[in-house]
Design a protein with these regions (language model features):
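C-terminal secondary-structure termini that scaffold catalytic or DNA-interacting sites
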Residues: 220, 225, 234-260, 266, ...
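Alpha-helix C-terminal capping/helix-coil junction sites
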Residues: 62-63, 111, 155, 203-204
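Short, basic (Lys/Arg/His-rich) helix/loop patches that form interaction surfaces
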Residues: 137, 187-197, 206, 254, ...
Length: 374
């Protein structure tokens, strides 16, 4: 239970109210309570109504288990960002690097010296609104997401009662304009890449991320079953190679078309299980920047599309799989998406509209002539 003391007046021996030696000095009302650890706490207020409101919220928090210590949020956003990043070791190195960049570029310049407890929802909304126009809507959403994740961590650590970034209005997301190659375009691009054409075909028909391709070893290619086990990824972060699990931290089995399995055979048969399937010319990890600079970008300039990136071959793989009749769950498994919803959000427009097919099929079943039984 929280107690409220009047620091300017007290009751004398005769029961009458009399002034204290602190009369007229500082805040008049003092709220006292014990926190869940039994420590004595106190906070001063100028007005009695403020003290009563604070005491009521304290008692509610103590009873409900949602109590937040007054000094818990007196940590600067800059310091909290460092702690939060240190606690995200489960993230992929590339994701962690992107989060760090967002924090250093956008969050710390605005919030670095601000205490967590001083952040208001209105201030966050004003800040986010100010980013609109300077950044693309997807970038604004990423900045907000990182900031909100940091503050959610503070809520779980009992430093904030709620997340002031929740409910902030974001700009309408721009629909990504994915580009997809057809089979002939894949063949043309692969041909222009010469000996590295197999890399283009592999990405276009398996949908692996570049880091998954670069980390693929011989022991994870089963030519008989025509399967590739995606279990590892390698990412270049700040010029350094960082090995880890795939983006969703889950292994997956990806099918190989027969022609691609045959093309991989010389790269797999008779080699050590831990050898890289797609090494660089020097025998180490094939880095995407080097691949683009030496091979891919020149081929793209010849056959297009303009500015095409190796990652867009992953979109191509989804498109070709869907055109071949794969359903959403197959595409999800192939690409390693965490949920089918994510797959539909990205590629739902590529799935054919089969509503009429379903109606026609039901019509055939219901209206089929009865066949007399013998």
């Amino acid at each position: 239970v929280a107690d409220i003391d009047d620091r300017w007046y007290r009751r004398g021996p005769d029961g009458r109210r009399e002034k204290t030696e602190r009369h007229g000095q500082g805040a008049r009302w003092l709220v006292r309570w014990r926190d869940p650890q039994g420590r004595q706490r106190k906070k001063s207020f100028k007005r009695k109504a403020e003290a009563e409101s604070y005491a009521a919220s304290l008692e509610h928090g103590l009873r409900s288990g949602s109590y937040i210590a007054p000094d818990a949020g007196r940590v600067s956003v800059g310091e909290w960002a460092t702690r939060w990043l240190d606690g995200q070791a489960h993230l992929a190195p590339s994701t962690l690097a992107r989060y760090r960049d967002v924090i250093e570029t956008h969050i710390v310049p605005r919030w670095g010296s601000v205490h967590l407890s001083s952040i208001t929802h209105a201030d966050v909304q004003t800040w986010i609104s100010g980013l609109v126009g300077r950044l693309a809507s997807t970038s604004v959403a990423k900045v907000h997401r990182v900031f909100s994740l940091m503050l959610a961590w503070a809520v779980r650590d009992a430093r904030l009662a709620r997340n002031p970034a929740e409910g902030v209005r974001l700009p309408r997301p721009e629909q990504p304009e994915h580009r997809y190659l057809d089979h002939d375009q894949v063949a043309a691009l692969a041909e222009r890449c010469g000996d590295h054409g197999v890399v283009v075909r592999f990405l276009a028909y398996t949908g692996l991320r570049w880091g998954e391709l670069a980390a693929l070893t011989v022991g994870r290619v089963d030519l008989r079953r025509r399967r590739v086990l995606v279990a590892e990824s390698v990412t270049e972060v700040g010029g350094r190679l960082v090995w880890g699990s795939p983006k969703t931290h889950e292994r997956r089995s990806v099918p190989l078309p027969r022609f691609l399995a045959e093309e991989l055979r010389p790269r797999v048969e008779g080699r050590r299980a831990d050898a890289l399937v797609f090494p660089s010319p020097r025998g180490d990890v094939l880095r995407v920047r080097n691949f683009r600079r030496r091979v891919f970008d020149a081929a793209v300039r010849e056959v297009g599309p303009e500015g095409f990136h190796p990652h867009e071959l992953r979109h191509t793989a989804a498109s070709l799989a869907i055109a071949s009749g794969a359903d959403v769950k197959i595409v999800q498994q192939m690409l390693g998406h965490k949920t089918a919803t994510m797959t539909l959000d990205l590629y739902g427009h590529l799935f054919p509209d089969r509503l009429n097919d379903i109606a026609d099929r039901m019509d055939q079943i219901v209206c089929a002539p009865d066949v007399p039984r013998e």
